[in-house]
Amino acid sequence: MRKNKAKEIIKAGKAVINGWLQIPSTVSAETMAQQGWDTLTIDMQHGLVDYTNAMPMMQVISATEIVPMARVNWNEPGQIMKILDA
């Protein structure tokens, strides 16, 4: 298991710099992952991203040291567990 860069930054008392993704595209996710963010959040609540888009986007982000995160569209345990499995 790789180290969580965001946790390390927070423990050091520094600010985590987060990017935001609302476009359902692995190309945009890969491009953003190469820009030096600490974390990238995939917005499934207000953007056009659904689970079928979010999973490959997370895979692309995970190929870098960036920590992928997701904002689910509702506080529903099933949706949260599904994206955690991604």
Model-derived segments and their meaning:
Residues 1-86:
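Expand to "…catalyze enediolate/carbanion chemistry for C-C bond making/breaking, isomerization
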